[in-house]
């Protein structure tokens, strides 16, 4: 049985809501908004008369209460516990019998019977295993927060991601206001679905039309700017690709790529030199996917190539044009999946021409 959270962007990522007895792992950089998201989930579930136990190993009950007041969390179905000893947490769960338990975070939990320090591989593995069996046995949905390493992977043993039912990554540029929730594993739904949120003073606000949000403030009639359409899961999203091609006096030109695969950009520059006869060897090339979002889809190829050519020729691309398609080594543009859905998304926002 599924329970919709009431947050449509989160339900989209989960595949329709939380499954009873499931174990969900949420990872993300410090300060990205994981705890804020979880408290807002508590409010929505509380409105559906669900009992929630929020266990924090990093903050006191008073500190959680301060944040909950700021986020206007008013549900009386939420109970707070500041504890790191899993044996005590299990006894509280047995006494309260909640529908949902949130553990923030799994790296702070410890078990008396395991001799190593909290956060160690054995402690994290054993704590997750105990919680998994507890949730399945009592049909309690568990949500655990996991710290991430400096390269973005969830800290702890890789088996942690194998043990849980769903792995969600909460990501985004801290300098930007938006956040992206991405499912990288989901036993009860599709993967690579994304939900888009905006961080405001009162918490996270859902972005129901991310294309319009991502293109806000886009300059028109400027060379090097091209709109493309990427597909994240089943959701088409319009994004702006910017390129700057600048003459250099150095022997080796600079190449940079932000938000996309650097090697792919270098390959496209080589294709433009060989097939389109653009003399880019004496020019620095800087390519950026605006908004700080990261996309690994090959459908960006055509937009990147057009943006580079536009900047090199100093000719602006028409503001009502969308470009997407994969480029091969011989210079051909290959078809990409769900082209009709991408075109429909572009038409919805008033674009009149698609180059595919």
What are these regions (language model features)?
Residues 1-15, 19-25, 32-39, 43, ...:
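Peripheral, non-AAA+ core regions of ATP-driven protein-machinery
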Residues 29, 57:
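P-loop (Walker A) phosphate-binding loop of NTP-binding proteins
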Residues 52-56:
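Conserved RecA-like ASCE P-loop NTPase motor core of nucleic-acid helicases/translocases
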